[in-house]
């Protein structure tokens, strides 16, 4: 199922105070990130990565709010706010995959980052090795990447595969001895691929529904016509100021709500997932969040369910099944 058929509407007069919601979101994200950092029986790299990822939702959201706030000075910036919202949507898939298998996907995530850095280094060598002022930089960068490679446990074959892929155009037959390396240092999965890796059928459905938002907002990151619309509106003198503001309210202001939803989904999955503990996950699984924090997450969804149809769809499809029940709920 990739949609939710609504039988209850929201109250369109039930407006939100964005500053208050920002504060409510922060009171969920910050203690949850801290809870990961303090969970010493989780892998050190995984818990640090999760804490940073959760906090980044707040950082990106602040940028979205700033772009929307300054739209009178820079009308085209509202389209950039939508591009950042797409980033928020995508981070949900990263969080979901990291939680699916912390050890496996943390390693893959870090290998993917090293691969990108190494490919960039190879390009720098190709383009700048003839410039004397880059001699020291290229050598020091190569040494740093090599030390990082060894620290991450990236094999010689994986390094060779990155070099081979960099040197050869797509479609070039891969050397047989690099077959295994091509899988272990492959790109970190995109959202559609993440869905295939998720084991929980209910979460799969919610992520499929969420992918509809990802596809729509991707039009802003891929320079579709919607990205150009703010400039078009500014140059179209037939639109009144109130008509332009109506477009902002119906199209671009949703960037703020979708950003709230992205943060809410990620925090819900991170707070409610029972994670394997101890060396190699040998200890009983347990949640990172305590009861008080779970109540805060549930209170956040009470707001998101009440004020957004997208939020209500996601709440009914997934969140209500993993969060503490609302008071008086059926």
Regions flagged by a language model, labelled:
Residues 1-48, 115-330:
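Secondary-shell segments that build the walls of catalytic and ion/ligand-binding clefts
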Residues 75-132:
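Long, hydrophobic, well-ordered secondary-structure blocks that form the structural core
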């Amino acid at each position: 199922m990739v949609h939710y058929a609504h039988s209850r509407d929201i109250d369109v007069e039930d407006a939100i105070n964005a500053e208050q919601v920002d504060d409510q979101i922060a009171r969920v994200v910050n203690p949850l990130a801290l809870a990961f950092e303090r969970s010493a029986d989780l892998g050190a790299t995984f818990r640090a990565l999760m804490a940073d990822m959760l906090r980044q939702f707040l950082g990106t959201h602040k940028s979205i709010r700033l772009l929307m706030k300054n739209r009178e000075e820079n009308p085209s910036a509202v389209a950039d706010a939508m591009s950042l919202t797409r980033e928020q949507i995508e981070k949900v898939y990263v969080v979901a995959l990291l939680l699916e298998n912390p050890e496996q996907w943390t390693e893959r995530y870090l290998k993917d980052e090293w691969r990108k850095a190494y490919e960039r280094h190879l390009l720098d060598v190709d383009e700048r090795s003839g410039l004397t002022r880059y001699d020291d930089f290229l050598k020091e960068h190569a040494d740093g990447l090599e030390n990082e490679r060894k620290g991450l446990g990236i094999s010689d074959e994986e390094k060779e595969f990155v070099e081979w892929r960099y040197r050869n155009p797509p479609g070039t037959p891969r050397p047989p001895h690099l077959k295994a390396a091509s899988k272990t240092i492959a790109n970190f999965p995109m959202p559609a691929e993440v869905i295939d890796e998720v084991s929980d059928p209910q979460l799969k459905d919610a992520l499929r529904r969420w992918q509809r938002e990802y596809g729509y907002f991707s039009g802003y990151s891929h320079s579709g016509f919607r990205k150009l619309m703010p400039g078009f509106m500014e140059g179209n003198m037939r639109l009144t100021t109130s008509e332009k503001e109506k477009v902002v309210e119906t199209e671009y202001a949703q960037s703020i709500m979708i950003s709230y939803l992205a943060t809410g989904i990620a925090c819900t999955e991170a707070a409610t997932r029972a994670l394997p503990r101890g060396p190699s996950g040998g200890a009983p699984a347990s949640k990172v969040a305590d009861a008080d924090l779970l109540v805060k997450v549930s209170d956040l969804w009470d707001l998101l369910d009440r004020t957004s149809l997208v939020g209500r769809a996601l709440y009914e499809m997934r969140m209500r099944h993993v969060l503490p029940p609302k008071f008086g709920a059926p």
